[in-house]
């Protein structure tokens, strides 16, 4: 299996399976001197973790990071950073009955067709367990971006099934298990998810992610566009079926006079472009959203075939998320941070001597 690495100057390679002994990653290209300690990974890893509420998978992993290399006396050395998390709560017997069956809507069939062999335990490499290491690598990128440029990356759940936020408050996002920006709606979400779990079905979701403080100039104009690489990064997350930058698909119904972000010396008057023009950051907030499909691991029977081609009904037992989007916010944040750090290093390598060009337009102003 190839294509397990991400990035150009700042790269991340992940490895491991859902029910293997461990998962891990190698982070290469991190500048030396960044202070980092194992306990700094805990917050974001726990934000992504399952088993924290009745609305996610009951699997409980400690997700304790081991730093194997690339850090000496608490500081990065500039050499590859090896990170490892040992799996401790696998329950592979849950998959014995479907080991030879292809779950509809899952990667079982495509992995089988590509490789002629697959690990059925928990989805193997196609499991969202892999994203744990993306979040771990993202901790490094987030810290470097914040210290070096003041960039803050954060996200929230912007749709759960048919439900959308009735208001917005960043302070509310971290105070509920949904990363929902309107606290008054949390009871409604709880009721909705309780009914969904009882029915045995699943539902899709949407996550928005925002990076504030991104300087103008990051990104490359043709094949290394910031928005193209960000879209690819978010699309690589399990279950993601669509990505928007800025207004995205809503742009189809807009007029040019509405969509263009007017510029004044005091700042841009809007941000329909999502902080990116011509593949290069404008200095405004970089905004993106991703849509996640409903999980296909259901306890409701569904028609499929097995490895022999026989028609069967598949029922997935075990521990699964009825909505994978609930835990996806820290994953989206991590992928945006990884893209931004890689682009920042590439910009510095080629254009570091350019300096600040006038006029420098501030980000969006309140109108």
Curated annotation (Swiss-Prot):
Domain of life (superkingdom): Bacteria
One GO MF term, please?
A: FMN binding
Reaction equation(s) it catalyzes? 5-O-(1-carboxyvinyl)-3-phosphoshikimate = chorismate + phosphate
- GO annotation, biological process: amino acid biosynthetic process; aromatic amino acid family biosynthetic process; chorismate biosynthetic process
Residues the entry annotates as binding NADP(+): 48, 54
Question: What is the originating organism of this protein?
Answer: Xanthomonas axonopodis pv. citri (strain 306)
Any single Gene Ontology cellular-component annotation:
cytosol
Annotated stretches, region: Disordered:
41-60
Free-text cofactor note = Reduced FMN (FMNH(2)).
Q: What name does this protein carry?
A: Chorismate synthase
- State the top-level EC class: lyase
Q: Does the keyword Flavoprotein apply?
A: yes
Functionally, this protein is described as follows:
This reaction introduces a second double bond into the aromatic ring system.
Q: Which family does it belong to?
A: Belongs to the chorismate synthase family.
Q: In which pathway does it act?
A: Metabolic intermediate biosynthesis; chorismate biosynthesis; chorismate from D-erythrose 4-phosphate and phosphoenolpyruvate: step 7/7
């Amino acid at each position: 299996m190839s294509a397990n690495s991400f990035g150009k100057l700042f790269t991340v390679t992940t490895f491991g399976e859902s029910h293997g002994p461990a998962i891990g990653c190698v982070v290469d290209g991190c500048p030396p001197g960044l202070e980092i300690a194992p306990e700094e990974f805990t917050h974001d890893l726990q934000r992504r973790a399952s088993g924290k509420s009745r609305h996610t998978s009951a699997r409980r992993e400690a997700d304790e990071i081991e730093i194997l290399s690339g850090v000496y006396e608490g500081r990065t050395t500039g050499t590859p950073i090896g990170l490892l998390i040992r799996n401790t709560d696998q329950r592979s017997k849950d998959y014995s009955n479907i080991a030879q069956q292809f779950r509809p809507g899952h990667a079982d069939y495509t992995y089988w067709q590509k490789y002629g062999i697959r690990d059925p335990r928990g989805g193997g490499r196609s499991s969202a367990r892999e994203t744990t290491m993306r979040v771990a690598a993202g901790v490094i990128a987030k810290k470097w971006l914040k210290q070096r440029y003041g960039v803050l990356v954060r996200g929230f759940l912007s749709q759960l099934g048919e439900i959308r936020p009735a208001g917005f408050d960043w302070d509310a996002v971290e105070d509920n298990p949904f990363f929902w920006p309107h606290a008054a709606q949390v009871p409604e979400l709880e009721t909705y998810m309780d009914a969904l779990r009882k029915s045995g079905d699943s539902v899709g979701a949407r996550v928005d992610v925002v990076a504030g403080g991104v300087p103008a100039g990051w990104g490359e104009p043709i094949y290394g566009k910031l928005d193209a690489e960000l879209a690819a990064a978010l699309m690589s997350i399990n279950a993601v079926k669509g990505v928007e930058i800025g207004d995205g698909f809503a742009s189809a119904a807009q007029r040019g006079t509405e969509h263009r972000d007017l510029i004044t010396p005091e700042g841009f008057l809007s941000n329909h472009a999502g902080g990116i023009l011509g593949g290069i950051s404008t200095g405004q907030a970089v905004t993106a959203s991703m849509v996640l499909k409903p999980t296909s691991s259901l306890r409701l029977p569904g028609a499929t075939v097995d490895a022999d081609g026989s028609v069967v009904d598949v029922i997935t037992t075990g521990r699964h998320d009825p909505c994978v989007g609930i835990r996806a916010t820290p994953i989206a944040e991590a992928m945006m941070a990884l893209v931004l750090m890689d682009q920042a290093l590439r910009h510095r390598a080629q254009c570091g001597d350019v300096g600040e060009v006038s006029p420098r337009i501030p980000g969006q102003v309140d109108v």
